[in-house]
Structures are given as structure tokens and as C-alpha cells.
């Protein structure tokens, strides 16, 4: 343990690297030794006889021979560590009695964190993991491949075409292929004349595919009324029901026709098993936190958590479409209701009732669910927004919105006919308010323009108290009648359920101030007509002006009047008094 310190005392002036090389000289066989001498030392392991080497254990003999033929690789790690220790001694960073401890500690740390054995073990472990994953993948692929081969062999025994519901039959087989391919821990195998599908993902479940398809053979494309579906459900065996339940997650709304019995049953299974599951760990954590905060009402807490965890999950909205039969029913209802509305002048509700009354009983019974939902939606649309109802009936390409399928009817709001429905946010913008608040006389023109463009009908005749201090032009004859002509105003839809509010609004719009009544009374009074001036009065006035010389120029009317007496050039006479020249 104290070897580095002892050697360092004997050769204090040597370089640390040279000193480390001297300290690390091996005492055994080296590459520079003679091969014959090395073999002699190996064979002469015992002093009694060279033949005694053969009597050594096999492991010892083999180890000695291997070491002599292929020497071990030299590891310079201890030499480098020894060089570092010698350098620390020369720089007096450590004492001589601490050299052995530092040397051992450095060797242990190198062996633990920077050993080639550790790196080799890590590489070997990574290789083993990769090999295990590759074997698992090959096993999984081979298992699915065998299941697909068995499934194809089973499908080859089934007919390619069915009398009814060919599209549903084809989509069902595609969903079966997808389930066999994607579901782990499942396989398809043959046992005797029958083929089986077995899965152990959530408990061991086995389905006899041969018997299930034999039971479903006569049910493809069958459309059963709502009341008779219980009778039809007795034809399904538990084996067939289990197959439908397993395939349901691999279908969508367009895979199987919804109006068929099998499509209806698969839809129920898919919606039943597709509900979001509550995370129990999250539920327990939130419950413990709420109890720590002092909220002991677990009933309201459970309701809140169930709502947050199950009803507020972001999902891709499903695509809903009508099948061919439902679209034909929709077009028939549109044509029938439009005929009752246009020809007989019936109300929307009466037109819908007459259309439903004239349907054939068997036709209505086979499509009762869809017809009831369609009539309910159209009745709501007619009651809430007549324009939307009219557009839906008269549009030959109209299709119901997604809320029609989910039952959440979101209809656009109609125009109730209130005065405040015409008010826009631009009227109360800060720019318009500041524009109206100015008091300069130069703002009269823009103010009149804003009044003319105001959406309020009553703003055209403001009280005189508001316009006090401003000069207004006199109104022309018949201007008020022209501006108040009802033909110029748009026809406003009356809101029949709110006739009281409408009458109050009409009464308030007819109220007028005393200034308005006074101005209207003055406009209705007949104005006196001024008599026309006689020609002889104008001539007399022009002659009098020419004689007195008080006017610089004659009247325009006298100048233009070329007939009669008088001096037509009176305006050319010089001003002032002129005396006699002689």
C-alpha cells in the first residue's frame, strides 16, 4: 500500500512519468523474455520432475498455456494513476502518508465509472434488449400473419354476395379484418370444421365465426320497425351478439346503414362502450385535496368531477349524413309542405300536420323515428324563425345541420321586428359621439348628414329645444308629407306575441312637442299671395328716378322694358351738378 511513497523517497528528482514506469514493472513473463526460457519455466512448475506439468489440473495447465501463447493485454490505467499521485506528491498537494490512500481511491473510482468491463456490459445489455424486441416483433408479426391466413381461409368459405345489404356485408368483413390485424393478444384458428376468433386482451373471449356468420346470413339489410325490433332480436344468438360487440369499436356511422337492424344494434354497442372512463387515480387525488381544504360534501364533488372528467373532453366532431332512404323522405316532405303553403295558403304548422296525416301507415311505421325527428325539427324552425323554415322547405338541396342528428337543435334567431334590432354598434362609436358633441357652427353640415343616415325614424324630427341656437332653413311646401310617406319606409314585421310593446312603441313615436306642433300648424296655414306689380308703376318709378338723379342706374326691369317713354340711358349720365359753360 505504501509502495508509491517509498519509491518516491528513493528517487525524488525523477520525472513522475518515469517514476511511474519504474514502479509498474511486472515481475512475471514479458514479451521481451526468451520464448524457450518462458516454456522452461512453464514446464518446470515443480522442482522434482518436468513431467509433473502433466499431472497439474486441466484448468491450471490450460491457463498457463494460454497466457504463454497469447499474453494478456497491458492496461496502462494504473500507470496513469500512479503518475498523477507522484505529481501530487511533487506539488505537495498531498502528504507522503496519504499517497497510498489516494492511489487506491482513484483506482476504485476508475474501475467503477470508467471501466471497459462496465462499458462492455452496457453494450451487451443493449444488444440483448434489441434482440429481445426483434424476437417479440417477429413473433407478433408471425402470429398476426397466421391469423390473417386463417381468416382468409374462413372468408373463402363464405359467399361473396348476399341477397340484401351487400354494402353492409362488405363493410362488416372489412371491420373484421381490421379487428384481427390491430387487436393484440388475439388470433384466428381452425378447430374441426369451424373457425374461431379468440382474444385475451380483457379476459378470455372466444367467438365461433362459422356459427356467427351462419346466424347473420339472413339478417343483412333487414329493416325492422321500432316496435318490431324485439321480435327480430330473438333471432340473434349470444355468439353473434358477442361478435357484434367486439366489432363495434372498429366501425363508424357510415359503415353500416343506421336504418337496418344490425346497423342500429352496432351503433348502440359502439355508443355504449365508447363512453369515456373516469381516471380513478385522478379522482382520488382531487377528492383528497378537496377534503384537505375543508369541503366534505362528496356528493356535489362527485357530480362536479364526473362532469369535468367525462363531458369536457375534446373530441373530433363526428360526420353525420343521411342515407338514400332518409334523403328521399326529406325531399318528399319538402315538396308536400311547399305545395300546401303555395297553393292552399296554409300555415307552416298546418302544412306539416297535413303532410304527416297523408303519409301511408306502413311507410310511416318503417321510418317512424326519422319522420318524428324531422317533423319536430321543422315545427321548431317554423315557430322560432319563419324565414329559416321557408328557406329549408324551398331549397331542393337543403340538408339538416349536425344538431338534427344529436337532438341539440340550434336554430338561428329570427327578426322580432323591434326598433332596437336596427341599431348597430357603429352608431355609438367614440368617433360618432365626439362628432355629435362639437359646438362649432361649421359642424352643422356633418350633423345634418348624420341625422339623415341615422337608423332611428324619430331622429329626423328632433325637438326644437335641441336645435336651439342654430339656424335652420325654411321647409318647402309638401316636404314633410314626402319625408313621412309610408311607402319610403321598409315594412316592419309585427311581433304578434308582443303586440302590447308594439302598440306602446307606436304611441310613443306619435308624441310631439309643442314646438313641433306649432311648426306644423304654421306650415298648414295659407300664405298671402303678393299681387303682381303693374307696368305703369314701374315706368313711373323709372321716370321719377331719371328726373331727380338720385339713382345711379335705372331699374333692371325698366332697362329690359324697351316699350314706352323715358330715358333708357339715364344710367350713363354724369354724377354731380354741372354749371353753364358760358
UniProtKB/Swiss-Prot annotation:
Subcellular location: Virion; Host nucleus
Site location (Cleavage): 565-566
Sorted UniProt keywords: Capsid decoration protein, Capsid protein, Host nucleus, Late protein, Phosphoprotein, Viral genome packaging, Viral release from host cell, Virion
Main location: virion
Post-translational modification: Cleaved near the C-terminus by the viral protease during virion maturation to form the mature protein.
Phosphothreonine: residues bearing it: 282
Keyword Phosphoprotein attached: yes
One GO cellular component, as annotated: host cell nucleus
Maturation-removed propeptide residues: 566-582
Basic residues: compositionally biased ranges: 530-543
Listed Polar residues bias regions: 451-471
Induction details: Expressed in the late phase of the viral replicative cycle.
Modified residues (Phosphotyrosine): 482
Bias type Basic and acidic residues, positions: 517-526
Region Binding to hexon-linking protein, annotated ranges: 146-259
General remark: All late proteins expressed from the major late promoter are produced by alternative splicing and alternative polyadenylation of the same gene giving rise to non-overlapping ORFs. A leader sequence is present in the N-terminus of all these mRNAs and is recognized by the viral shutoff protein to provide expression although conventional translation via ribosome scanning from the cap has been shut off in the host cell.
Sequence similarity: Belongs to the adenoviridae hexon-linking protein IIIa family.
SUBUNIT field: Interacts with hexon proteins; this interaction tethers the peripentonal hexons to hexons situated in the facet. Interacts with the penton protein (via N-terminus). Interacts with packaging protein 3; this interaction is required to promote correct genome packaging.
Function according to Swiss-Prot or TrEMBL: Structural component of the virion that acts as a cement protein on the capsid exterior which mediates the interactions between the hexons, including the peripentonal hexons, and reaches all the way to the penton vertices. Two hexon linking proteins IIIa, one from each facet, stabilize the unique edge interface between a pair of facets. As the virus enters the host cell, hexon linking proteins IIIa are shed concomitant with virion acidification in the endosome.
Protein name (Swiss-Prot/TrEMBL): Pre-hexon-linking protein IIIa
Species this chain originates from: Human adenovirus A serotype 12 (HAdV-12)
Lineage: Viruses, Varidnaviria, Bamfordvirae, Preplasmiviricota, Tectiliviricetes
Amino acid at each position: 500500500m505504501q509502495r508509491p511513497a517509498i519509491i518516491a523517497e528513493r528517487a525524488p528528482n525523477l520525472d513522475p512519468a518515469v517514476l511511474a514506469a519504474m514502479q509498474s514493472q511486472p515481475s512475471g513473463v514479458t514479451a521481451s523474455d526468451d520464448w524457450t526460457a518462458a516454456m522452461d519455466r512453464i514446464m518446470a512448475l515443480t522442482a522434482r520432475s518436468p513431467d509433473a506439468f502433466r499431472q497439474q489440473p486441466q484448468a491450471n495447465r490450460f491457463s498457463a498455456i494460454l497466457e504463454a501463447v497469447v499474453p494478456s493485454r497491458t492496461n496502462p490505467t494504473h500507470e496513469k494513476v500512479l503518475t498523477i499521485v507522484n505529481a501530487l506528491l511533487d506539488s505537495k498537494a498531498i502528504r507522503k502518508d496519504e499517497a497510498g490512500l489516494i492511489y487506491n481511491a482513484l483506482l476504485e473510482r476508475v474501475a467503477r465509472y470508467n471501466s471497459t468491463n462496465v462499458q462492455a456490459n452496457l453494450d451487451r445489455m443493449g444488444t440483448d434488449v434489441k434482440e429481445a424486441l426483434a424476437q417479440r416483433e417477429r413473433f407478433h408479426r408471425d402470429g398476426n400473419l397466421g391469423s390473417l391466413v386463417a381468416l382468409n381461409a374462413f372468408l373463402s368459405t363464405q359467399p361473396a354476395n348476399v341477397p340484401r345489404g351487400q354494402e353492409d356485408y362488405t363493410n362488416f368483413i372489412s371491420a373484421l379484418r381490421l379487428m384481427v390485424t390491430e387487436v393484440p393478444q388475439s388470433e384466428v384458428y381452425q378447430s374441426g370444421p369451424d373457425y374461431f376468433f379468440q382474444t385475451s386482451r380483457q379476459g378470455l373471449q372466444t367467438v365461433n365465426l362459422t356459427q356467427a356468420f351462419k346466424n347473420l346470413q339472413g339478417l343483412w339489410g333487414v329493416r325492422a320497425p321500432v316496435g318490431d325490433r324485439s321480435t327480430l332480436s330473438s333471432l340473434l344468438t349470444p355468439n353473434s351478439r358477442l361478435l357484434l360487440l367486439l366489432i363495434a369499436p372498429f366501425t363508424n356511422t357510415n359503415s353500416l346503414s343506421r336504418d337496418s337492424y344490425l346497423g342500429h344494434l352496432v351503433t348502440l354497442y359502439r355508443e355504449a362502450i365508447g363512453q369515456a372512463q373516469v381516471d380513478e387515480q385522478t379522482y382520488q387525488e382531487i377528492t383528497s385535496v378537496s377534503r384537505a381544504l375543508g369541503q366534505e360534501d362528496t356528493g356535489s364533488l362527485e357530480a362536479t368531477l364526473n362532469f369535468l372528467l367525462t363531458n369536457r373532453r375534446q373530441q373530433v366532431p363526428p360526420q353525420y349524413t343521411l342515407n338514400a332512404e332518409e334523403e328521399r323522405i326529406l325531399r318528399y316532405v319538402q315538396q308536400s309542405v311547399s305545395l300546401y303553403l303555395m297553393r292552399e295558403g296554409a300555415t307552416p304548422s298546418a302544412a306539416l300536420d297535413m303532410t304527416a296525416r297523408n303519409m301511408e301507415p306502413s311507410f310511416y311505421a318503417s321510418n317512424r323515428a326519422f319522420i318524428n325527428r324531422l317533423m319536430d325539427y321543422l315545427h321548431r324552425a317554423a315557430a322560432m324563425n319563419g324565414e329559416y323554415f321557408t328557406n329549408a322547405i324551398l331549397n331542393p338541396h337543403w340538408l339538416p345541420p349536425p344538431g338534427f342528428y344529436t337532438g341539440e337543435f340550434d336554430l338561428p334567431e329570427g327578426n322580432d321586428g323591434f326598433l332596437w334590432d336596427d341599431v348597430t354598434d357603429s352608431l355609438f362609436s367614440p368617433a360618432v359621439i365626439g362628432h355629435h358633441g362639437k359646438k362649432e357652427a361649421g359642424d352643422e353640415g356633418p350633423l345634418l348628414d348624420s341625422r339623415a343616415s341615422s337608423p332611428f325614424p324619430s331622429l329626423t324630427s328632433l325637438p326644437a329645444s335641441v336645435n336651439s341656437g342654430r339656424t335652420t332653413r325654411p321647409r318647402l311646401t309638401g316636404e314633410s308629407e314626402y319625408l313621412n310617406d309610408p311607402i319610403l319606409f321598409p315594412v316592419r314585421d309585427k311581433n304578434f306575441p308582443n303586440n302590447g310593446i308594439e302598440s306602446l312603441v307606436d304611441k310613443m313615436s306619435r308624441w310631439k312637442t309643442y314646438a313641433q306642433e306649432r311648426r306644423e300648424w304654421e306650415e298648414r296655414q295659407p300664405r298671402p299671395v303678393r299681387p303682381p306689380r303693374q307696368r305703369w308703376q314701374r315706368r313711373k318709378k323709372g321716370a321719377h328716378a331719371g328726373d331727380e338723379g338720385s339713382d345711379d342706374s335705372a331699374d333692371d326691369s325698366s332697362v329690359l322694358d324697351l316699350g314706352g317713354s323715358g330715358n333708357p340711358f339715364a344710367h350713363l349720365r354724369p354724377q354731380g351738378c354741372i354749371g353753364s359753360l358760358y
